[in-house]
């Protein structure tokens, strides 16, 4: 079971994001959000919809595990060819694609390698994830490198989802404590 409050080690004094509270703030401000996820396999979307009323702000998302699926949904294949599927450029293209398809205020794109290296993609590095939070037209892209040795795939997905929610809270509500 996914804990609604996922804590992270922080270098500042701000508390880790309470996901349910974040979603309630999005609902209260009528701020819509969509996702295109690869390495988190839909966990971010699932965690959004764990909050009652989320359907008011979450029209949907895509799980695009394969390059071909990303391209089918609308990611430009030239982005994958030029920068690789595991890149901030691909994460941004994923966010822009889902935002365009679902017409949301905020879109999240996330791609990376959570466990074993991907034999189909040369840019695969274990524990390296890229995500982009697109707020209206402003892209905020992140690279996270983590030693995932000894962690289960689910623990890794939870950790990266928490990073996304923490960044989302800071970007969407910068004045909150």
Regions found by a protein language model. Name each.
Residues 2-177:
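Short alpha-helical segments enriched in small residues
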